[in-house]
Every structure is written in C-alpha cells, then in structure tokens.
Amino acid sequence: MSLLDNLGELQTLPNGLVTYRSGAGVALICLENLPANGYSHDMMLDLDQAILRARFDDAVQVLVLIGAGDKFFCAGADIGVLQSITPTFKYQFCLHANETLLRLEHTPKLVIAGLGGHCVGGGLEIALACDLRIARAGSGKCGLPEVKLGVLPGTGGTQRLSRIVGASRAIELMASGRTFGFEEALELGLVDELSAADSDEAFVESLLEYAQTFTSPNCAPLAVGMIKRAVKSGMEVPLESGLALERELQQRLFASEDAQEGMRSFSEKRKPEFQGR
C-alpha cells in the first residue's frame, strides 16, 4: 500500500479549489485549479482554511503543499480575474494573500512545498512562504516575471526572495523577469532538493516519505516547530532579542516529554521514540 493510500479521506474545501487529506502525521494540501492551478481570492480562502485545519490538528506534524497534475505547481494569480476586479478589490486580494502566506509561515509546524511542475509568479511566492522546497528534476521552470506585466511580485516575492538569495540577486531576477529551471533554482538556494522521481505519483510518494522523517517517532515535532519559530521570528529582530526568544523556546522544550525521552535515550544508548508532546 502506498503512503498516499494511508492518508485519510480526501476532503474538498468549500470553493472546490483546494483538497485536503491527512494521516501518519502529515497533511497533504493540493491546489486544484487545472490546467495551471492559477489562484484567485476563492482559492486563497480555501488555502487559508486548509492551513488552519492543519494548524489546529494535533495529529498533523508536517504540512505538504502540492499542485494538481504534472504540469504546474501554480502559475500564480489568474490574470483574467485581476483584469475584471476593481483597484480596491485588487488591494484587498493582495492583502488577504499576504495574510494567508504569513499564516503558513507562522504555523509552528514544518511546511514542505512539492514543486512537480512550473512554479512562476504568485506560485513561486506561495512556495517561498514554505519552509522547504523540493522540486521534481526537469519538470518545469520557476521565476517572478511580473515586471513583464508592468507590476511587481505583490504576494511577498520582493521580501521573501531577497531574504533567500540576497538583495542584488533578487533584484536581478525580478527586474529581468526571467524564468529558469529547477536545477538553477537549486544552485540559487530557492530549491532545497531535487527529486529524481519519474512520475507525478512517484514524486508525491517521495514527498510523503520525506515528510515522515520529520514526524514522531522519528523526530521531535515540537522541537522542529520551535526551531522554525526561532529562525523565522529571530531573523526579523536584533540578535539579542533573537537570543532571548531562543532561550524562552528552549525552556519550553526542556519541559516536554520528548526532551525527557531524547535525553533518556541518549544516556541509554538507544534510538529515541518521540511522541510529539
């Protein structure tokens, strides 16, 4: 039986643009708007609900975000929709998208983006809000080409890309609007790992297998969540404040059952059996 089969019942969010299923410590969230999985306000509402569902489910320790089909992870915002809405709604649309992706970043659980196809514009901006990005080798290109439409990447691209690749490289990539393969993305640090999976199904299986290495009993998910919070929050404040946050989070972890099990297993020279509490 595949790892995908071990997940629970497939659930479709209210607008029909995101699906959700979970099991074995992992929530699999899929953008479902073929052919290119372009996003709209309705999709962001669905994605927002999926993130909150995973956040509040104690059984979920890792989130995996993918796109339906094998051509696109996400092609970004639906241009046709953007042309048909008012300037005020455009602003509110961008604001809600920013809030949704911040919710993804603020969720104290590991979030992995599985890029099994093209990942451009707002699609890359969604992926940049994830903690790790795994791409299927040769399956597509990525980039932020919004400048070719006379606008800038408005769903966090100017901020998150520069934090990952540095300011000058980020400006060059966005000002040129060029797209590039996942192999170059790996060199730039935009992608953390390339998968050699030969099909979309095999790629999803490899993502789930990778995600489960961060779940109990293999890993201490509370510690992973605190590491994420320390890094994400700490990089935005002075070093001294970041160190203070680190100490507070460490103190909370010292009181956890997983920390006691980790230290006990180390002393007993055996593999720890973490419980996620």
Stretch-by-stretch model annotation:
Residues 121, 177-184:
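Acidic, divalent-metal-coordinating active-site segment for phosphoryl/phosphodiester hydrolysis
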Residues 1-66, 102:
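Conserved CoA-thioester-binding segment of acyl-CoA-metabolizing enzymes
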Residues 100, 104, 114, 120-174, ...:
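CoA-thioester-processing core
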Residues 46, 67-100, 119:
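Glycine- (often His-adjacent) and acidic-residue-rich active-site loop
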Residues 44, 158, 167, 204, ...:
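A general structural signal for well-ordered alpha-helical segments in protein cores
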Residues 53, 135-140, 182, 191-244, ...:
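C-terminal long alpha-helix characteristic of the crotonase
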